């Protein structure tokens, strides 16, 4: 949907000016009038008239008049409406919403601060409702949309800002009383949330601090956390706080009741343990951070590729809980699945064991004060594994207690990683979705995806004004329904040969018009859906737009995309297989930054021939890491008829990238022989759905980089393990009471993550 003001009309068409001062020729509708603000669809845009260029000077004058008129009306209407606003209540889940409160302590307006919030607020009528009523409706809608799940830990940050002088000169003299009533209402909302098993935190801000949050384009609540972090000398930037997981953020900063008025209590201090909803249901555990002990944390886990345990038998007192299994390095073909290929969980379901430890603290090996990581006998792999253990894992300490907070000994605990924090992805294509083997392989092996061609300009708009997203929408819905995150590739492509044919023939004036339309259409269509966008593919190798529209078009593409969808992350994306190309990419990002562009990440293509030089790759990653940005291998493949060499190439890239601290994801550019753009010699899955050697190597790595820990609690009710970052399913079996299921989010952080599960 595009919003703009009508500047001129004839019998069939109208010219509108959008909020970013783009001029569009659109189909006229009956409700249009010159000067009126209207909404039009992408499909309403028609090819620009020849007269549009001549019209621009007149349009500019009209635009100035419309802008001045708009400011006058906005000033009059805005002042009238806002005189009755005296307080603001912020709600941060991941959707961030701000409620404007009038003197009646009712909602005057609900503002969406991000795309997720727009989705939540759609269809909700919150005006004239109390804060408690509004919070309840927002939470219910967030549950329906999956932003809040009873199967995982949830926390809601509520922030307030009140105008203590708002009542001066008005009929409402008792502002302090109004504020007291407002906090009573907030308390009721908090109480309702607590009864639902949702943890809350409340923070107060001044109006000046609220204004500062608006200037920084961050919610009140997250800005309050930023101020708290500064106060406690916690090194977090505003950008990091904008994007951080709330649960991890609050634990790291240590948000408690210090900023909360005395009459607002967010949690029962005598009941900070997990809220259990009963056997076989999810509960919300208490999560706290501890600093590492002075001794070296133990690494008591071992990896195996033999599968997972299907049952949770109770252990006798004579058995050793959490026995460690340490297999050797093998690449034998795993058991065959019904598809004929090896059956492996999503890069998300490993096999690991851990030893239960005494007390709560960092994990310590039973028999050794030094870290133990099994050696493969291959030096570069051992070195990579040391780095992986350091940067991709964290210690966890689970404590199981009864309703009286007494530790439960010999409770059987199983922790299984169900979704890896690291991105393991693939390019997918609509033309293969007919095959159930294809879709099953995606669901079983990947947590990220990118569309091979379906979100590129030449696919979305093959002829000027003929726009379609049908194939992309189909792929997105498949990913969404299977919990797979999506990278957007790409808004533009700087190489001339990859432009739509009609774009190559445009003069600069019309091309500039087309660039705006593409931004509005593509980014607007996928707003709130794509996690990442590659803004302009291959900027260090092409100059189609730059040569025709000037170098300023590059910053404009990034900045305008962010205006349309401020919640996506915007990447540069280039083929980088040499150190020179890495230097060129660093120079490009630094130039964009000098032009006021915020670049969120660096995408690296890796389309290799018959070899992958791991030392060269590490050198490239080291050069790019000086930018202090997340790095993604966005397109990987290697073409060679020797499938064993192809397997070695795959491991060289995956293990080198996974062991580099700046890399956050790896996306292979297809996997199945039949639809791979480079054919059989680049695939990991044969046409008949058997794995070739490269596929077996891939599955072996995925098994190696997953975690399954199991064992029994000790006398203090404790069980510990070290696992990869990600989401875990925790199952606690208590003899005589049954089985209890929980969800644990193991995020990056210092020290041991401690959590307590209370068994009723």
Curated annotation (Swiss-Prot):
The alphabetical list of record keywords is: Carbohydrate metabolism, Cell membrane, Glycosidase, Hydrolase, Membrane, Polysaccharide degradation, Transmembrane, Transmembrane helix, Xylan degradation
Its principal location?
Answer: membrane
Query: What's the Enzyme Commission number for this chain?
Result: 3.2.1.8
Subcellular location, record wording: Cell membrane
- Which residues belong to any copy of the RsgI N-terminal anti-sigma domain? 2-49
- One GO molecular-function entry: endo-1,4-beta-xylanase activity
At the top of the EC hierarchy, this enzyme's class is hydrolase
- The stretches that face the Cytoplasmic side, renumbered to this chain, are 1-55
Against InterPro entries, the record matches this protein to:
Anti-sigma_RsgI_N, GH10, GH10_dom, Glycoside_hydrolase_SF, RsgI_M
Question: What single Pfam family name could you report for this chain, choosing any that match?
Answer: RsgI_N
Q: Which reaction does it catalyse?
A: Endohydrolysis of (1->4)-beta-D-xylosidic linkages in xylans
**Signal peptide residues on this chain, from the entry's feature table:** none
- The annotated active site, in chain numbering, is 538 (proton donor), 635 (nucleophile)
Please indicate which superkingdom the organism of origin belongs to.
Bacteria
BP terms from Gene Ontology: xylan catabolic process
Q: Where is this region: Disordered?
A: 274-352
GO cellular component terms attached to this protein's record: plasma membrane
Membrane-side (Extracellular) residue stretches: 77-760
Q: Where are the transmembrane segments?
A: 56-76
Q: Where is the composition biased (Polar residues)?
A: 291-352
Q: What exactly does this protein do?
A: Anti-sigma factor for SigI6. Negatively regulates SigI6 activity through direct interaction. Binding of the polysaccharide substrate to the extracellular C-terminal sensing domain of RsgI6 may induce a conformational change in its N-terminal cytoplasmic region, leading to the release and activation of SigI6. Binds to and hydrolyzes insoluble and soluble xylan substrates. Has low enzymatic activity.
Summary of subunit composition and partner proteins: Interacts (via RsgI N-terminal anti-sigma domain) with SigI6.
Its family? In the C-terminal section; belongs to the glycosyl hydrolase 10 (cellulase F) family.
Per its record, how is this protein called by name?
Answer: Anti-sigma-I factor RsgI6
Q: Which organism is it from?
A: Acetivibrio thermocellus (strain ATCC 27405 / DSM 1237 / JCM 9322 / NBRC 103400 / NCIMB 10682 / NRRL B-4536 / VPI 7372) (Clostridium thermocellum)
